[in-house]
A protein has these predicted regions:
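Glycine-rich, positively charged N-terminal anion/phosphate-binding segment
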Residues: 2-8, 28-111
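N-terminal small/glycine-rich loop or linker at the start of catalytic domains
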Residues: 5-19, 59, 79-86, 107-123, ...
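Active-site mouth loops of central-metabolism enzymes
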Residues: 14-28, 88-94, 117-132, 189-197, ...
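Flexible loop residues that form catalytic
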Residues: 23, 48, 153, 219, ...
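Alpha/beta enzyme core
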Residues: 33-38, 42, 125-272, 280-296, ...
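C-terminal helical cap(s) of enzyme catalytic domains, especially alpha/beta-barrels
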Residues: 52-70, 223-244, 299-330
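Active-site beta->alpha loop and helix N-cap motifs at the rims of alpha/beta catalytic domains
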Residues: 69-170
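C-terminal extensions of enzymes
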Residues: 287-288, 294-365
Length: 365
């Protein structure tokens, strides 16, 4: 049986399931074109908005590392260390909509077989903001974008009516989706915050209002570390810091839990998996928990010599997925997507010790 890397996700045909997430790797036409040349199946643009954006006057992203010989997390690049996580307090794109539009049109015309998903964000709570959602959506679709991702997940927005600040309000989720759906007919993905005690309820509201997919997980709210000698944070401006987003390999297990929660609650719905993918092993785990599309960020940003778009990474992901499909005799990822669902159970359903069972250990005489 011939295998294929191509997938159909939310009605869109992807040449492969691997796409770059909304982040610095997709912040410009130059980077997106380079990503498509390297082989990525799609991109989610860095979030586009209408309100003025001004980032902090200092490093916007740092990379944390750890090792076995010195088991603490630090941004210091010692020779014995490996990647642990990324931390950022970067806001959405500071490039205005009128500059994005011709770039998006050129990108799509240059790579018609690649999927361009525009990440957009506006506020909430009044008709003016609902109109802003509509304007953003219609503008990006008119220049050729294949789908829209609603950013309801950024953990450190400069406004309280945006990003993760509104993602716990199911009525706001519905109202934003209704506004956007009234303006465009392309698939709408909703990127929800993982920092929610009612994530399944939020997903239910989104799916119920017409979302084609949920994207999980964005970065987790977090703080950088303080050095015990200098008393400085590893990233700060004038000695001050604010909550930022933790991503990369450190959030993999939490991301899988949340994808699993949504997938088990809505097994017939689509999920785009994000959070800690550095290679096929991590991607595989998102697929078996129900994700039909895979977004990558930190690993691409960290790859040296790639301009932050993961040139070697996408080749490895495609090669390893193709090898796995051939080895297992699968025709596509759909043949094993979601197979872990039935094996995730309540704690009370896991077997306890008994006279004849000792948790896999030998029973002493």
């Amino acid at each position: 049986m011939a295998s294929t890397l191509s997938t159909t996700f939310t009605g869109l045909d992807f040449v492969n399931p691997f796409i770059l997430a909304s982040a610095p790797p997709t912040e410009s036409k130059r980077k997106i074109m380079k990503a498509f040349e390297a082989g990525w199946g799609g991109v989610v643009t860095k979030t586009i908005g209408l309100h003025p954006v001004e980032n902090v006057a200092g490093p916007k992203t740092i990379y944390q590392r750890t090792s076995e010989t010195k088991p603490y997390v630090s941004r210091i690049k010692r020779p014995d260390t490996v990647s642990h996580s990324s931390w950022n307090w970067e806001l959405i794109s500071d490039q205005p909509l009128d500059l994005w539009l011709p770039d998006l049109e050129e990108i799509k015309s240059s790579y018609p077989d690649r999927m361009v998903i525009a990440s957009i964000m506006a506020g909430a709570g009044n008709q003016e903001e609902m109109d802003n959602w509509k304007k953003l959506a219609k503008s990006v679709v008119d220049v050729g974008c294949d789908a829209i991702e609603l950013n309801l997940s950024c953990p450190h927005m400069d406004r309280k009516d945006m990003g993760a600040n509104v993602a716990n309000d199911e009525e706001i989720i519905r109202s934003i989706l209704q506004a956007v759906k009234s303006a465009v007919s392309v698939p709408i993905w909703v990127k929800l915050t993982p920092a929610s005690s009612s994530l399944v309820d939020g997903a239910a509201a989104a799916y119920g209002a017409g979302a084609a997919s949920i994207s999980l997980c964005n970065t987790f709210p977090s703080l950088p570390l303080m050095d015990p000698e200098t008393l400085k944070f590893e990233v700060e401006v004038d000695g001050l810091v604010t909550s930022g987003g933790l991503g990369g390999l450190a959030i993999l297990h939490q991301a899988l839990q949340r994808v699993s929660d949504i997938s088990r609650a809505f097994p017939d719905k689509s999920i785009s998996g994000i959070g800690g993918i550095r290679g096929f092993r991590e991607a595989f785990n998102f697929i078996v928990h129900g994700a039909g599309n895979l977004q990558v960020c930190t690993a691409a940003m960290e790859e040296k010599g790639s301009g932050g778009v993961g040139i070697k990474l996408i080749q490895e992901l495609k090669d390893d997925l193709r090898d796995y499909l051939d080895h297992k005799g699968h025709s596509s990822i759909e043949e094993f997507r979601g197979i872990a669902r039935e094996r995730i159970v309540e704690h009370s359903q896991v077997r306890r010790k008994s006279e004849n069972y000792n948790g896999g250990f030998a029973i002493s005489a």
